[in-house]
Amino acid sequence: ATGASKWNDPKDFPWTMGFQPSYRVEARIFAKYILKNKPDAKVAVFYANDDFGKDYVTGLKDVFGDKASSIIVAEESYETTEPSIDSHIVKLKGTGADVFVNIATPKFAAQAIKKMAELEWKPMHLMTDVSISIGAVMKPAGLEASEGVLSAGYLKDASDPQWKDDEGMKKFMSFVDKYMPGANISDANLVYGYAAAQTMVQVLKQSGDNLTRENVMKQAASLKDFAADTLIPGIKINTGANDFAPIEQLKMMRFKSGQWELFGDIISAETGG
C-alpha cells in the first residue's frame, strides 16, 4: 500500500484497509513536533502537486488549525516533471522561514537538501519518510549536507546494531535466515512485509474458524494494541469500524553521522477533534 489517506475510508471502501501510517498522519505528527519545539515557527512547506503532497498539507493544517495561516509563511508546490527544483528552494529561503517541511519524493528531496546547503540555509528541516533512504537520498545530496535532517519512523532497521539484542528483531532474523537465506536485511521492505504479514496472521487468529469475507474484515477492524515484532517499541496497531488506519503513531529521528537516530517519545497523530 501507499500512505494515501484514501485507504482509510470505511464508508466508501469497506473492504479496503492500508497498513503503513498515512501521509496525513505523518504530517500531523510533524506539526505537533513543530508546535512543541518551535512554538513561534515560521514554516515553509514544499510539496509535490499531487495527492501525496496535498495529503501532507492537509495533515499539517489539521494540527495548526486556525493558526495555520500565520504559522505557514509559504506553500510551494512542484511538478514531478520538473528537471530541477532549485528555484523553488531559493524562493522559500527568501521568505525568512525557520522551519522547512520537505514533502518531496526521493529525487527532489535530495535536490532540496543539496540546494539548501549551497545556499547555507539551515532551518529546522523535516522530511517525509518516503525519502529517508540513505542510498537514494542522503548520499546523493551529500552526507554532510544531510546532517540534522529530521523525519519520523515506525519500523526497526534490521541493519542497525541497536536492535541486535531485541527479541522481536531476533525472531525476524531467524525467519529470514530460514525462509530467505542471503536476503538483503537492509531492505526496509522485508521489515515492512514481515510486520504486515504478522498483523494478517493476528487477524486470522481472531477470525477463528469463521473465515468468511465479512468476519475477516470485521476482525481486521478490531485490532487492539497489537505490537508486531518489527515495529519500534511503543508503537501499537489499533483499528475500529470507523478507523481503518492501523498505525497512527511515529517516533522522531534525526540524520546524524551517516545514519538515522531515533529520539524522543512516541507521538500520536490524534488531534482530539
Model-predicted segments: where are they?
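Sec-exported extracytoplasmic/periplasmic mature domains
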Residues: L35-D40, K61-S69, V90-A97, K114-W121, ...
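Extracellular/periplasmic periplasmic-binding protein-like sensory domains
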Residues: F13, M116-Y192, I266-E270
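Catalytic-loop motifs flanking and including active-site residues across diverse enzymes
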Residues: E26, Y56, F108, G168, ...
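Segments of small-molecule ligand-sensing domains
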Residues: K178-V191, V201-W260
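Extracytoplasmic ligand/sensor domains, especially the bilobed periplasmic-binding protein
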Residues: A1-E76, H125-S151
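Structural motif
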Residues: E26-I29, S77-K91
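Periplasmic-binding protein-like
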Residues: A1, K42-Y47, G96-P106, A112, ...
